[in-house]
Amino acid sequence: NGGYILQIDGTCEGDSPNLFTGMDEISGIILSSVKINSEKKEKIIPFLRDIQVKYGTPLAIVSDMGKGLLGAVQEVFPQVSSLICHFHFLRDIGKDLLDDDYRDLRNRLTNSKIRVALRSKAKDFEEKLGQKMRDLAKIDGDPELAATKTALLFINWMFDTSSLSGYGFPFDVKHLLFYHRLISGYEQMKQLYELTGNKPFYQLIKLLRRIDDDQELERTASLLDKNEMIFNELRKALRITLPGNQQGLNDSGEMCDMKSIADKVDKFVKKYDSSTDSLHLKMIEQIRKYDEKLFADPIIVTVDGQKIYVQPHRTNNIMEQFFRYLKRLLRKKGGNISVKRSLTAMLPGTVLVKNLKNEEYLDLLLDGTSGLEERFAQIDSRVFLYEFSKMKSQNKKPPADAKK
């Protein structure tokens, strides 16, 4: 197929070793996997050199922005185009832009104990409605019960996060959404109380007034609104993790011309280049620093005498999706939410089994034989034992529950 594009990423849980894996994004074949105790440059270089020896030099490399990883790539493959994942890039930009104010907002909301108060009030309302919850006609016919039902619905709405996209922070700012719902709910309760004078509305007004009166919360939320708007502009320029998109962590970005995206990002940079805000200037500095690693022209390769164009992926989502798939399997097998012990005990080469679902890989592996049994029978047992001992040397003693 003219070569391979190397995607690199790692996964761990707690203080487990990092399962560091390389995959060809064109074929989807996992090329290699090792365990390392950190993502320092000197730990990653042997992994990359091994891939270079086995598979040659890749057409391009896609990874996250880890300093050690980028340094190792530069040392082993200095002439290869090294690209960073747009999702990781945006996530880092967003955290730098929003994190401090977002933490302040979250802490002030926590200290206000508004969530506890609202949940307690919701429980009171539910008990008041009791069995009548199933008979809406009886509730709506009683003004006080109807007001209780409405107030309860407003509380549930304040806590609702279904409008979020599923990307996590900084793409989803659930605490800022909650704050705005509280303020909106407060205004709605005041209007309803003025119209009806019903007690449940007044009870919510008393709870929510502390949030509306908190000027520091209002100031912090205002700063977040401003910077979230700027962050969303950059998301739109890069055409990935767009607000309102429901793909969540499976979002690999829209199929767009790279030059068009680069031009829009350039316009974004020029728009905020003159800002006096230190957060904005740091954001612009980051974009300029990684500019060459963000936008790649299609790569021309020759296959069967014909020139074809290969466009590297904009994200390393295929690696992220694989790791989520692996952790789901480990949770299902071990029966534990945490996969730390299973990752620690697992031989790094285990992930290569996933390749057996790839028809192209299976054809290469079988090499004309009728099946895996016949193919494995051709392998010298001494070679197998040598390779197996190498893999075992990377592992601690497996815990009992990991042997299931």
Model features per residue range: what roles?
Residues 77-101, 105-106:
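Inter-helix linker motif
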Residues 57, 103, 118, 122, ...:
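Intrinsically disordered or highly flexible coil/loop and linker segments, enriched in small
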Residues 255-337:
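Amphipathic alpha-helical
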Residues 1-79, 99-103, 125-192, 318:
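RNase H-like nuclease fold core
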